[in-house]
Design a protein with these regions (language model features):
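Glycine-rich ThDP/TPP pyrophosphate-binding loop and its adjacent helix/strand module
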Residues: 2-171
Length: 172
């Protein structure tokens, strides 16, 4: 969101009324830097507010969502995408309060730039943890089912990693 091609794309979509959905997944940082040093107004949706469609003009629709709120996201995204398809008004989804437990790159730990408070918040509001709690609270699955799914997923990743390494290591 800090580079020219992002802004050019949003501007062109707003001018031409292209049915485009753009999702900005915001964990509060931009390449290891707090967004207050990376984004005007510390919010991409606030910075984009001048692009907001008004009566009788072109532009885009802007939606703010919380990444850990699956039900809330569904309530907003589904009708917004339908509106975008029907009207060709581009939609920008600013998904805030995302967690990123591994940081932005492999060059160093995210613990070097996130405060202890932020790291604790991320443990509590981890999107996967929140989704799991939502599934259980809404009786969409039992604890045992989720444990089995998680175990199967870990095993699948482990086997896929081994298979990829074998292919990489094999002679050409």
């Amino acid at each position: 969101t800090s580079e020219g091609h992002f802004w050019e794309t949003i501007n062109a979509a707003g001018v031409l009324q292209v049915p485009l959905a753009v999702f900005v997944w915001d964990n509060g940082y931009g390449i290891s830097v707090p967004k207050k040093f990376q984004t005007t107004k510390s919010s991409i949706s606030d910075a984009l507010s001048g692009f907001q469609k008004q009566e009788g003009t072109n532009g885009v629709d802007i939606y703010k969502l919380k990444g850990w709120d699956y039900a809330g996201m569904c309530e907003v995204i589904e009708p917004a995408l339908q509106k975008m398809r029907d009207t060709h008004i581009p939609a920008i989804f600013h998904v805030e309060e995302m967690t990123q437990p591994q940081g932005h790159s492999t060059s160093g730990s995210h613990e070097r730039y996130k405060s202890a408070e932020r790291l604790e918040w991320e443990k509590e509001w981890d999107c996967i943890k929140q989704m799991r709690e939502w599934v259980l609270e809404n009786a969409l699955a039992e604890e045992e089912e989720l444990i089995k799914i998680e175990e199967d997923a870990k095993e699948f990743v482990k086997q896929s990693k081994l298979a990829a390494w074998d292919k990489y290591s094999a002679p050409i």
